[in-house]
Structures are given as C-alpha cells and as structure tokens.
C-alpha cells in the first residue's frame, strides 16, 4: 500500500489512540539519521513472487508452527523471532519497533536476517540504543510520511506491517501464523492494536 492510500488510515489511528504525528515524524527523522545502508532491494527480492509466511507473536504461534511451510520466506513479528529460534528457524526478516529486541536480534542480523526497524513516537531511546549495534541488513520504516530510506508500506503493529510489506513488494501468497486477534489476556492498548490489526488486514482480504 502506498502512502497516499495509507494516510487516511494513519490519521484514524492517530485519533483513536491519541498519538502524536509530530512525535512520529521526529522518530522517523532520527531513524533516517541512523540508517547507514538501505537493504530494501534485498527485502524486495525476498518478497517478489514468493510464498511468504508471517509469524506473529501470539501464544498460539508454537502450535501454528506445526503447519509452517519451511520452504517459504519466513518473516517474524518482533519477539516471534525468539520462538522461531527455539525451533531452529532463523527468519528471513524481523519486523520490529525494538520493544522486544534482544541480543538474539543482533546475532540473527549478523547472520543475514533483515531487520525491518520501525520508528514511532514512543521508541526514540530504543532506536538510539539498537540501531548502531546492527551490523547486517536493515530496512527503516515509519507509520507517517516516508523519508528517503525510511519507508511506509502500510500497517501499524509489527505483524500487520510485515503482511503489508510482503503484499506491497509482490509476494505471490502470504500465510499468517501466530496471530490471535481475539486474545482476551491483553491490556486495553494492546486490545486496540488487535482491533486495528483486524481492520487493516481486512483491507488486504484477510479475515482474521
């Protein structure tokens, strides 16, 4: 989804949560200043014409992995990377706003996993801490107006951003595992994010 299509949804999200567009733009500028190389061509190559599996970090992920097509291009939403690692799987890309980042992310990135790092108004300290430590491929994203080398393919939370990115970059099919949009054991903010994940994924034809 290009930004002109995404922008109306973004403003709805800002209003729903009371988030600051100015803070998002500040974070995007910070991330732009920390990007040393844009790995978007590599990410686009992974997606184009491929079968992509996006793994969310819901508790159901471990059960869902019994159906994982290991020949697919595997994307992890943030801490889902830890679950995949326990099963000996290194994802092709991790989509993260860094709130679930650990040193495992550094090791995966060094081994070739693309870190798709997202900037928003609440994660400036995490951007400053983690970005200089990544030695492998990185793609930078924002939920607001894109900048040179800071992209916006649509989507809001880590999981749905991964789906939107795969779709925009030409994946042939996208399978979703580890998404539980009806999880009752979440706080109100997370519940709102699940509401928006369902609403946004429906734009791409996913009934979750």
Regions from the language model: what does each represent?
Residues 51-58, 73-75:
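Short, hydrophobic/glycine-enriched beta-strand segments
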Residues 54-56, 118, 141, 176-178:
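Short beta-strand segments
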Residues 34-37, 44-46, 72-73, 79-171:
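Acidic/Gly/His-enriched mid-domain segments of enzyme catalytic cores or analogous surface patches
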Residues 90-91, 169-187:
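Glycine-rich phosphate/pyrophosphate-binding loops
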Residues 58-69:
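Short, contiguous, helix-prone interaction/anchoring segments in small proteins
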Residues 78-79, 192:
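Short beta->alpha linker loops
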Residues 1-52, 62-64, 179, 184-208:
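N-terminal donor/sugar-recognition subdomains of glycan-related enzymes
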Residues 59-61, 81-82, 158, 181:
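Short, flexible micro-motifs
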